[in-house]
Amino acid sequence: MNGASRGDVQRPTPVQAPAKRPIPPTVFRFEKASKIGTSLDTTPKELPIRRPVPLPGPRFVKDVNPSPPATSSPNVQTQCHQPPVVRSQTHQASVSQTTPTQTTPSQYTPASVSTARAPQFHRSSHVTPSQQQRIEQAFGPAPVSQSQPQNGSYIQYNEPSTSVASTTTSFYSPNESEPVFTHAISFKPNEPENGQKAREQLELLDSGKINEINQSKVPTTIELPPNCKLFQYSWVLDGIPRTLLVPMPMDATEEDVKAMLPKTLEMDSNLFNNARPRDELPVLSFPNGTVPNVEMIGPKVQQPMLVNPKQFNRIMRRREMRQQLEASGRLPLARQKYLHESRHLHALKRKRGLDGRFDNTKTAESSSMVSSTTSPRKLKRRNRLPGEETSDSSSIVLPSPVEIQPKGGIVNSSMPSTSTGYINNGMDHQTDYIEHQQPMSTYDQYHDHVQYIAPDGNVNYHNNHDNGVDLTGSDGQSFTNL
């Protein structure tokens, strides 16, 4: 099935690429890479190569209020990580004497700091006691280290190294006797606290303004009698919103409030603000911890309904479609009051409960009362049977032939009839039936021959012995089965 019946498939011959000629060795040129060139090629352009500079060990303390920066600033290598450490004057002199002797080349290259961006300050020759106290409060007392440097490029201290600037005498200019710093931290005097600032600002204000500010911060307290409610009236006078709270009895109305207010106020129902939250009301004090009812007068302000953009676009789309249908006449301009008027009328007639819902129990009770008041019409029956005592055979009242069922038994008087319409309207037009009926003295005579006049005027006879099953009782009564 998979192509085996067709035979072997002829495979194409693979195409072989022509052999390529080897590349002659004269094309390549080998050059010996120098060490300097390799370092230059591998070094990024953003990091220029710096020659190692000896890092001596003296550390200097800057002035709190430094002098103006120097005009000429040499290229200084610095490294700052922590605030400067205070040193005594004698210790600085001893360190400065040993600095020139340590000029051995170092293997450590510190980071270069540009002197164009950083401020440059001179070292102060003297530190005042107040400045020393401020420095100790800010950074704590600095321990003095007695360790000597082991190498010219590495200086070891027991405490953390926080050198602000590191220079050598070779970088000094001829006319300068003090080193130049590229980094400095200024100590500002302690600023007054927030409370002190507030007091200074309040001292500048007038005493009358201070009283107004204090009075505005005191909450308003209103004492109300029990069993009362508040009416809130808001209006704007000269651009200033004003609010009036009127306490009234529990049964008071809007008309009573209008009568209480002065006539100068323009009473408008729209001025009664019913949308103001209770949080904005002044603080109220009620007797016995009770809270009166607050009744807002006027129509409720309809708040806008917030929808998302998708719902908004859909709403606008439906409005456009409705306008198009109304313009074309396919949609009536006035909507129908009820979709089915008959259902509405039926709903009005139904009984409802206290909550407005339909009450099915009341409907069932009303229907049962109607059925009990209209009792069905009972069937007429014979007074006596032939075997029973009878006073006068001529007084037997025979029922109408429609009510007599020759094939059935005795009808129970307590059983309601289900064919009232047939009884009332079945043989009403036969008014001459009783006149043509002949009296019978015995039941057998009546049972053998039942005679009645049909609507067409013919006399019909029915023989009851041939139909049904004989149900003769012990007393000789004969009945027929239904």
From Swiss-Prot:
Tissue spec. comment: Expressed in certain parts of the gonads with high expression in fertilized oocytes in the uterus and mature oocytes from the distal to the proximal arm of the gonad, but weak expression in the syncytial ovaries and immature oocytes at the beginning of the proximal arm of the gonad. Highly expressed in the head ganglia neurons and the developing hermaphrodite vulva and male tail. Weakly expressed in most somatic cells.
Motif (Subunit association domain (SAD)): 306-329
Cellular localisation: Nucleus
Pfam families to which the protein is assigned, alphabetical: CBFB_NFYA
Biased composition regions of type Polar residues, renumbered to the chain: 72-93, 126-135, 144-160
This protein's UniProt keywords: DNA-binding, Nucleus, Repressor, Transcription, Transcription regulation
Signal sequence region: none
GO biological process: negative regulation of transcription by RNA polymerase II; positive regulation of nematode male tail tip morphogenesis; regulation of gene expression; regulation of transcription by RNA polymerase II; tissue development
Region span, Disordered: 1-160, 344-414
Low complexity bias locations: 94-110, 363-375
GO cellular component: CCAAT-binding factor complex; nucleus
Gene Ontology MF terms in the entry: DNA binding; DNA-binding transcription factor activity, RNA polymerase II-specific; DNA-binding transcription repressor activity
Domain of life of the organism encoding this protein: Eukaryota
DNA-binding region: 336-361
Phenotypic consequence of gene deletion: RNAi-mediated knockdown results in ectopic expression of the homeobox protein egl-5 in the head region of hermaphrodites. RNAi-mediated knockdown results in morphological defects in the male tail due to cell transformation defects whereby anterior seam cells adopt a posterior seam cell fate, which is indicated by ectopic expression of the ray-specific protein pkd-2 in the anterior mid-body region. This leads to impaired cell identities of the rays derived from seam cells. These animals also have defective cell transformations in the ventral cord and generate two extra serotonergic CP neurons.
UniProt feature, compositional bias: Basic and acidic residues: 353-362
Subunit structure of this chain's protein: Forms a heterotrimeric transcription factor complex (nfya-1-NF-Y complex) composed of nfya-1, nfyb-1 and nfyc-1, which binds to 5'-CCAAT-3' box motif in the promoters of its target genes. Interacts with the nfyb-1 and nfyc-1 dimer; the interaction is required for subsequent binding to the 5'-CCAAT-3' box motif in DNA. Does not interact with either nfyb-1 or nfyc-1 in their monomeric form. Interacts with mes-3.
Biological role stated in the UniProt entry: Component of the sequence-specific heterotrimeric transcription factor (nfya-1-NF-Y) which specifically recognizes a 5'-CCAAT-3' box motif found in the promoters of its target genes to regulate their expression and control cellular identity in particular tissue types. In association with the components in the nfya-1-NF-Y complex, represses the expression of the T-box transcription factor tbx-2 throughout larval development, which most likely restricts its expression to certain tissues. May act to repress txb-2 expression in conjunction with tbx-2 itself, which has an autoregulatory role.
Family to which the UniProt record says this protein belongs: Belongs to the NFYA/HAP2 subunit family.
Entry protein name: Nuclear transcription factor Y subunit nfya-1
Native organism: Caenorhabditis elegans
Gene it is expressed from: nfya-1
